[in-house]
Amino acid sequence: MTQTRLHFTTGKIEAERIFAALELAFEDEGLPIAVLEVDEDQDIHEVSLYADGDVDTVEARVKDILAGLALSKPVEREVLPDIDWVARSLEGLKPVRAGRFFVHGAHDRRKRHSGELAIEIEAGLAFGTGHHGTTSGCLEMLEKVVRREHPRNALDLGTGSAVLAIAVAKLAHIPVLATDIDPVAVKVAAANARLNHVKALIETVTAPGFHHPIFGRRAPFDLIVANILARPLMRLAPQMAGHIALGGSIVLSGILERQRDAVISAYVGQNFRHVRTLYREGWVTIHLKH
């Protein structure tokens, strides 16, 4: 999908205020936001927001935010070339080891050690290569949970590349439902499941949250993993409680360290209890039981 960069210049102090406001406003969408120093002597900083889909609506929201800060800036657009940045970045990435898991691209197949569970991720347009602190944290946590609890029916909500669904399938040899709101991600997930020889265990479905008939047929789950963002995770707490089996576990990530307590509180309010937290690169992975 073609991406558009919305950008404007301002001073450093204003740029920091704007960045904080944009980050808060677009947290649910997960739109990338950046501030670049253009000229230190002249105090010129460029603020950029990267959008796809309805760019007009995003630009209007940006202008409303600027107006709310009593700032008026001409917002410019730059249409970026349609490049598969995940594919390009994977070309130079080293494999990742997280617990027993070895996540790699095709170019590193031979680097697997004896006893490791290898997951090969085809370069694609879906998030989740194992290199991000949230994904590696989830892999480590899943190994602990599966080893101790022996789940029989799992859900990977917001599957992205399906790296976590594949991890559960390989580790526990159980059926896994892998869902995502993005149909492109679902196609990538299915391809990666085939590539890793677990397609028979992983069912991939395009679904926003829990809004799909498949959940009525497959629930309750005794293991749910969701590596998305803190605010959507908090909103999903009641639905998580409605789809988890009694005594089941959920593994949550995509959460900044400063967001940890708020996420845990949302789930404690739905009769979950906190088991443990893993900290990785400023992010946390949380294990809770129902």
From Swiss-Prot:
Keywords: Cytoplasm, Methyltransferase, S-adenosyl-L-methionine, Transferase. Belongs to the methyltransferase superfamily. PrmA family. InterPro entries: Ribosomal_L11_MeTrfase_PrmA (IPR050078), Ribosomal_PrmA_MeTrfase (IPR004498), SAM-dependent_MTases_sf (IPR029063). Its main location: cytoplasm. Methylates ribosomal protein L11. One of its GO terms (cellular component) is cytoplasm. S-adenosyl-L-methionine binds at T135, G158, D180, N227. GO terms for molecular function: protein-lysine N-methyltransferase activity. GO terms for biological process: methylation. Its EC number is 2.1.1.-. It is an enzyme of class 2 (transferase). It catalyses: L-lysyl-[protein] + 3 S-adenosyl-L-methionine = N(6),N(6),N(6)-trimethyl-L-lysyl-[protein] + 3 S-adenosyl-L-homocysteine + 3 H(+). The lineage of its organism: Bacteria, Pseudomonadati, Pseudomonadota, Alphaproteobacteria, Hyphomicrobiales. Coiled coil: none annotated. PANTHER family: ELECTRON TRANSFER FLAVOPROTEIN BETA SUBUNIT LYSINE METHYLTRANSFERASE. This is Ribosomal protein L11 methyltransferase. It is found in: Cytoplasm.
